[in-house]
Amino acid sequence: MAAALQRIEQLSSRVVRVLGCNPGPMTLQGTNTYLVGTGSRRILIDTGEPSVPEYISCLKQALVEFDTAIQEILVTHWHSDHSGGIVDICKNINNDTTYCIKKLRRNPQREEIIGNGEQQFIYIENGDVVKTEGATLRVLYTPGHTDDHMALLLEEENAIFSGDCILGEGTTIFEDLYDYMNSLNNLLKIKANIIYPGHGPVIHNAEAKILEYISHRNNREEQIISLFRDNFEKSFTVTELRTMIYKDVPENLHKMAEHNLLLHLRKLEKDGKIFYTTTPVKKWKAVL
């Protein structure tokens, strides 16, 4: 069972967590949104889901409690549990205030619309710095979970806001395992002290958590490589591989297992370790 989190909690002298009030299997206790800084105007990281009045109420309460206002909004990635609350915040905080809303571009680029289109994202890039009183945030491009995912390094604390790249509990999902593993390794190089995740409790041993994530994926990958190594002359469909790799997975999870397996296969293909043929059906085989 996920650990209970307070709806509003001061985590450090410059970080306040406001829970998104949207608990669920994918969001754990809810989306973590953060007010960052020490002054009368602070940066809001992520916005929760649309149409959650409890969250707007909590955010208003936090702004009053800490005698501050929103300077601007940073969105870690496009998923609706992180970007969906933008319109509600703009409408209900300070009477239709138009905030500066920043994120990374989708890759490949595509049009992104906020609400009815009255507001637009301001696109930032890897390495950009966003400042407010008491806080300096450096943008870290961390694709894998999504193509536009960013983490943020809070330089004053050597802490990472990880979005959904790393969660406080359990593991995350991803679109591209090759990019995701590169992102984990890049975050590891920072040698951060703390991780403020997009869901779940604060992670106080950042290095150990990142290594745990890397190990989890490497173990599955090694299992797949071993199967190809032991059957070097053979080629396999994804379904055939699933029956050997995920032997104990119930039938209702077969599609998800095959999806995860396919992400591993695509990474191994990028690594030059396997390839596939499509005649008569798509099959994967070890590289000679």
From Swiss-Prot:
Keyword Hydrolase included in the entry's annotation: yes
Documented EC number(s): 3.1.27.-
Any single GO CC term annotated in Swiss-Prot or TrEMBL for this entry: mitochondrial matrix
SUPFAM superfamilies: Metallo-hydrolase/oxidoreductase
Annotated residues for binding of Zn(2+) 2: 81-82, 118, 164, 199
Keywords: Acetylation, Endonuclease, Hydrolase, Metal-binding, Mitochondrion, Nuclease, Phosphoprotein, RNA-binding, Zinc
Record PTM N6-acetyllysine, positions in chain: 102, 282
Enzyme class, broadest EC rank: hydrolase
Biological role stated in the UniProt entry: Endoribonuclease; cleaves preferentially 3' to purine-pyrimidine dinucleotide motifs in single-stranded RNA. The cleavage product contains a free 3' -OH group. Has no activity with double-stranded RNA or DNA. Required for normal mitochondrial function and cell viability.
Protein name from the UniProt record: Endoribonuclease LACTB2
